[in-house]
Each structure stands twice: as structure tokens, then as C-alpha cells.
Amino acid sequence: MNLEELKKRQEKIRNFSIIAHIDHGKSTLADRILEKTETVSSREMQAQLLDSMDLERERGITIKLNAIELNYTAKDGETYIFHLIDTPGHVDFTYEVSRSLAACEGAILVVDAAQGIEAQTLANVYLALDNDLEIMPIINKIDLPAADPERVRTEIEDVIGLDASEAVLASAKAGIGIEEILEQIVEKVPAPTGDVTAPLKALIFDSVYDAYRGVILQVRVMDGVVKPGDKIQLMSNSKTFDVAEVGIFTPKAVGRDFLATGDVGYIAASIKTVQDTRVGDTVTLATNPAAEPLHGYKQMNPMVFAGLYPIESNKYNDLREALEKLQLNDASLQFEPETSQALGFGFRCGFLGLLHMDVIQERLEREFNIDLIMTAPSVIYKVNLTDGESMDVSNPSEFPDPTKIATIEEPYVKAQIMVPQEFVGAVMELAQRKRGDFVTMDYIDDNRVNVIYQIPLAEIVFDFFDKLKSSTRGYASFDYELSEYRPSKLVKMDILLNGDKVDALSFIVHKDFAYERGKLIVDKLKKIIPRQQFEVPIQAAIGHKIVARTDIKALRKNVLAKCYGGDVSRKRKLLEKQKAGKKRMKSIGSVEVPQEAFLSVLSMDEE
């Protein structure tokens, strides 16, 4: 293609993504767009085509972003090239969303006609505004009996401040309004700005590992052209590679002769090691490099940490490889090796949130066949010592000696909870119970309220979301961002089994709740840990002070069964002998701790 043709082609490109709260019909809309533009034959069509991971389909959520090229012949007779970049809607995957938005010029905002705006919708809209995208509101599910498109229209205007007068009323499921949406994309989404003649700059927004071809980069070309045979250079580490193939996804990978400015596609360049490529990096040509890289993404810092240990210790290296491969297309996952006396060798991993942690654990077990034990999640605490030093600690077993600690600060998050009015009381009670501080409350419309709290991240980390859903019959939606560190009265609680500390069961708790939390846990462990041949005391301790204790009674054989009648001293002799045996056993015996015990420390609530 000559220059003229390339420039003409660029004017016909539209890059957009679809943003929505969970279950507002994002993946279904993507399916309809694929069908309407005949990108996918009816034979290959399946619901939620872009959610290719089994886990995504089962949970009905989108985890990974996806990029697809479609051709659409508009009413003006021209053929346009659309790049649809699918994004996740869940709070833990905000990072994925920001990555896909950086590769677009426009965004379709899908809002459910019955439910209206939810917390997550807002969070994603702000991300889109940060990236200066053209936002097109669409009111979906208008065929539902409870749909009230006019109310939602005013909501979009009042809460987000977007002009919704031209918002398309659609139903992705019934296929209503799809054509209008496509026409609006042509009219409203700007063509990519970029210079075909400038040195190549392409943003890596994702990467996948292919056993045969190495690392495959998914890129959005900002300037210039890349074709097979070029020598490319990664700007963060200056490594160079030869391009073997470039192409696009029409869900399946299809090879092309070139990728030019505005294109979204993949580059395969036999990149062997996972460490070389970072999402957010800039690709340029080694022969004619760009002067400076594109500003990539802000590095996401993990909020939640947990230990992952293989149940079979010989799988340690497999676990490392699996984590490296997952890190490739999930740049927010971080891990480092750690050891535990109770669990052996494993990794300390950092996650963006609980769902993220869950999904990673499931992907490791499914895709890589590794059985895992996971310790209680914790957050990063700032510990100020008496000698003026301060340290960040994410693992409770690394906490310094309590006598050396001056103060401990913990992270607080600003939590936005959107909820129908009748549940406001329940939400406030839950937030108070989780040590939250009330900030403010606004009414979105007559019935829905946006409540904002400052809550310690540690309280949100394990079951806040579930509790919120159950106390509001599933109507609340929730979004949080880190706001600040505050000093708190925190203590480290150790659990002792048979007098020995189990490092993997230690956790950090607020002083005021320490006693009841300790009592709950020892009672819970008593139910879970199987009875041994000897008596096992379970104790919860803060420093050297035991705050709660319970005993697992010993299993014992009835040694008197063979004495029919007979002298009491004979019976006593047998019982004394048994007691001495149990005592000897107790001094050398060790206690097996089942996997549930580690998790029970988490799901602590008034059970």
C-alpha cells in the first residue's frame, strides 16, 4: 500500500471499547456486533464468544481484555474497520480496563435500563474520561418488563454529566438497536490520530505465551508501520527481536502483511523469555527508533497479599513457571519466594483484590494442575519502630517484636457503596462493624443512595463483599480505592497448637476485637483439626499473653474392656499406664493441620 492509501485507510479506522457494570450486557452486545458485521459465521457463534477462558464463562464475568477487528459497511456505502476491545467490569480488574482504554479513541457505555447506573459504571467512566475518550451512552435491556429508559437517561445526565439525548435504546439479547449503535460508532468515534510516516511506536497492551512461537505481543500501533522481517526494539530494556509475523484477531489470529497507524493486532517475534516484555511498554524499530516511549500505564500496586504453597513440595518449580506465565498477561500479579515452617516452600503473592486472588488460584489449579494451600490474605502495614526506623510488612509472620513497635499504620480505602434506600441502614451497620468511618451520602434518584465510607482495607479484604451482598439481597454495588494510611491499635495474634506456633496461622487484628477473634478462631480450629491420640491444646496469644484456649480431647481406647469385675486397683493400674503412654506421645507428637484450618482464620465472622 502506498502512503495515500494508508492515510485513507487510517481515516476509516474506529477503535472503541465497551464499558459497563457486571451483568449489564456487555459481552452480549459484543456478540451481537460480531454477528451483525458477519465477523463470525453463525456456525462458530456461541454466547459470550470473547470470554474465552472457561473460568470467565462459568462465572459469567470478563477477566481478560480481548481485541477484535471487524469490517462494517456503513449506510454511506464506505467500509469501516472497527477494533472492538472488550474490557472487564469488575473492580479488581480496573487495571485491565485502563489498559484497554489506552488503546482506544472511543467507548460505548452500556447501562442497564432496569438497574441504572452502578458504582462500577462510574469508576470505568472516570477511567475513560482520564483517557480523553469519546463516550457514547447506550441504554440496554429495554425489552425487560422493569425497564425504565427515561429514568436511566436522566440518571446518566445527572450522575455522570454526559449528554444522553442521543443515547441508543437497545436490547443486545433481542438484537434491537444494534445497527444504530454501529452507525453512531462511525459518526462519533474519532479516527486514530497518528503519523504513518513517523518512526514506529506501538503500545503493548497485552501479551500471551505460545509454546511454539514464544511471547506474542498484542499492540495498538500509534505511529508508523510494522511488517514481518522488521527488527523491533522494546524501549524499556532496548532488547531487539526479528518480527516473524504480524496480524489481527477476528477472534482467531489471522496473519497480515503489515500493521499501520491505528491498527490493533499482534506481533510474533520469537521472544523467548517472559521477563523481556512488560505490558505498557513501547515497541519501535531498531533501525529507526522513536525518540521517546509512549507514556504507558501507571504501575498497579497490589493491595492484598497471601502465601501460595504447593501441596506436593516437589511442584515448587512448576508453581514458579506457572506464576511467570500468568504474570505475562496479568502485569498486576507480583510474587516472591518465601518459606514457612508449617507449609514448606512457596511464594508470597500480591493481588489487586479478592476476586483477582480467587481467579489466579483457580487458574493455577486448572490450567497448570497444581494443588495449592493459600494462607490468609493480608495488606501492607507500615510499622514504625521505637528507634525511629519504619518498615512495610505484608506478612504477619514477619512482624517485629511487639516491644520494638512504636505505632502501626494500616491502609484505609474510600469505599463507594450504591444501594437502594431501604438497605441504607443495613449497609451502615455493616460498615460500622468493619470499623468504617462515615464520610457522606448522596441521593442518585428517589430510591438509590450513594454512601461513602473510609474503611480499613484489612476489613474489606476477606468477606466484606459477600456480607454486603447478603445484607442488601444482592442490590448493592461497590467500588473502592486506596486513600491513606492511618495509625491504628493493631496487634499480631499467634495461634499455638500443642505449644508450638503455627506461622501460617498468624494474623493482624485490632486490639479491641482481639479477644473475641481469638476465641472464635480457637473454637473453630477445634472443630476442624481431627482428634489425635493425645490431648492438643489450641491457644491464641498476643506476644506472651494467652487470650483464649481450648483443648482437643484425646482419642482413647477403652483399656478396661477386658476386666470383667475384678479389683479396682487392677483397673487403676491399666488407666495409669494408658495415661503415661499418652503423655509420652504428647511430648513427641506433631499435629497435622488440614487446609480448611488456614481458610477458617479468614472467614471469621459471627458464625
Curated annotation (Swiss-Prot):
GO terms for cellular component: plasma membrane. GTP binds at residues 23-28, 140-143. Residues 11-193 form the tr-type G domain. Pfam families: EFG_C (PF00679), GTP_EFTU (PF00009), GTP_EFTU_D2 (PF03144), LepA_C (PF06421). Transmembrane segments: none annotated. Keywords: Cell membrane, GTP-binding, Hydrolase, Membrane, Nucleotide-binding, Protein biosynthesis. SMART domains: EFG_C. It catalyses: GTP + H2O = GDP + phosphate + H(+). Required for accurate and efficient protein synthesis under certain stress conditions. May act as a fidelity factor of the translation reaction, by catalyzing a one-codon backward translocation of tRNAs on improperly translocated ribosomes. Back-translocation proceeds from a post-translocation (POST) complex to a pre-translocation (PRE) complex, thus giving elongation factor G a second chance to translocate the tRNAs correctly. Binds to ribosomes in a GTP-dependent manner. HAMAP family: LepA (MF_00071). This is Elongation factor 4.
